[in-house]
């Protein structure tokens, strides 16, 4: 009978997951939350797996596609590369928290411009657009070229029109 392999005794044991000394506090869509798990956990998994906020999508996992875009402290961030430790103490806004009750002007413009094809990138696109309009309420065409989310379906012309429509709506509503 052959011998069963035995793990090498000199193999390094795996380190235990570092736990924060106290739970990490953050606000998500205006509600307070605490995380007492691994501080290196990506914010994306906390949103999707713990809170079941599945509007923020997983795609590339390295922060380059924009499917997981959220607002962190009011600024655009990729949830797949933002750790819970980095998110602690900040306000996080996901697509679910972009508006309360009625559609946000960006969401309405997305519908009116018939932007959605497959829809997978749309929450990331909308969050990137929200960040852009916060910084530039009157975006120019060149501002729209650098929108921070990739779209496999090629909806970019419709996305640009929707952002310009939403910008006008937001300006008109501010009057």
Go through each PLM region and give its residues:
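Signature of N-terminal electron-transfer/Fe-S-associated modules in redox systems
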Residues: 1-175
């Amino acid at each position: 009978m052959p011998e069963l392999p035995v793990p090498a005794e000199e193999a390094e044991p795996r380190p235990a997951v570092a736990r924060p000394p106290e739970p990490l506090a953050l606000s998500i869509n205006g509600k307070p939350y605490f995380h007492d798990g691994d501080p290196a956990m990506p914010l994306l998994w906390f949103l999707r797996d713990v809170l079941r906020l599945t509007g923020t999508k997983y795609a590339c996992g390295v922060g380059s596609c924009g499917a997981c875009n959220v607002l962190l402290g009011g600024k655009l961030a990729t949830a797949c590369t933002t750790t819970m430790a980095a998110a602690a103490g900040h306000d996080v806004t996901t697509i679910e928290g972009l508006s309360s009750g009625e559609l946000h002007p960006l969401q309405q413009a997305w519908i009116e411009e018939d932007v959605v094809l497959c829809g997978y990138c749309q929450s990331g696109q909308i969050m990137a657009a929200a960040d852009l309009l916060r910084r530039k309420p009157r975006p120019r065409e060149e501002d729209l070229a650098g929108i921070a989310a990739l779209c496999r379906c090629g909806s970019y012309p419709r996305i640009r029109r929707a952002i310009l429509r939403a910008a006008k709506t937001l300006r008109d509503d501010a009057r």
